[in-house]
Amino acid sequence: MKKQLMTSCLFAAVLAAPAFAEDADVLQSRLNQVNSFHASFTQRVTGAEGGAVQEGEGELWIKRPNLFNWHMTTPDESVLVSDGKTLWFYNPFVEQAIANWLKNATGNTPFMLITRNSAADWGQYNVKQQGDSFSLVPKADNGNLKQFTINVTANGTITGFTAVEQDGQRSTYQLKSQKNGPVDDAKFHFTLPKGVTLDDQRQ
């Protein structure tokens, strides 16, 4: 009986693997339809028990594969910019900026996954499609991300995404007023403001 059960489980796993791969291909194909866009977004962070932890809003510019500008305007301003080589994080309140090599940035965060849209990245997840919603669960249980869901239409427009961490904290982003098309490269250049301290970790 145990042998039969094990055989059934293995057979089910073999059948599921191609389905996960096909759904990942659909997701990547949809995202590839729009390689540059601008959108505004709202953010809602809730704790494991569902209580609101933070709400905010901001703007987002993306030009795949490696250019992006994520500007959180409320409740506290912060800026995350990639110029293709360096990843800049700027916090105006503390007057500090941090610089890291983009190639060293983790690929298991929702924003990096969406921006890079790399087959190698998606291959690290079991992807399941339900209409315009794609649920991703890491194959390796060694990170902080428990589950990631992205909503993207058939024409490549991202309407929102949600990340659930291992401790149950949930971050939900709703995108609106998305404008697909060319984005000025100036949006992806970061100039250190006068008087701001730079923590340069590109060593």
Swiss-Prot record:
Gene3D superfamilies: Lipoprotein localisation LolA/LolB/LppX. Keywords: Chaperone, Periplasm, Protein transport, Signal, Transport. One of its GO terms (biological process) is lipoprotein transport. The keyword Signal applies. GO terms for cellular component: outer membrane-bounded periplasmic space. CDD domains: LolA (cd16325). Residues 1-21 form the signal peptide. InterPro entries: LolA/LolB/LppX, OM_lipoprot_carrier_LolA-like, OM_lipoprot_carrier_LolA_Pbac. It is found in: Periplasm. SUPFAM superfamilies: Prokaryotic lipoproteins and lipoprotein localization factors. The keyword Signal applies. It comes from the Bacteria. Transmembrane segments: none annotated. Belongs to the LolA family. Monomer. Participates in the translocation of lipoproteins from the inner membrane to the outer membrane. Only forms a complex with a lipoprotein if the residue after the N-terminal Cys is not an aspartate (The Asp acts as a targeting signal to indicate that the lipoprotein should stay in the inner membrane). NCBIfam families: lolA. This is Outer-membrane lipoprotein carrier protein. It comes from Sodalis glossinidius (strain morsitans). The gene is lolA.
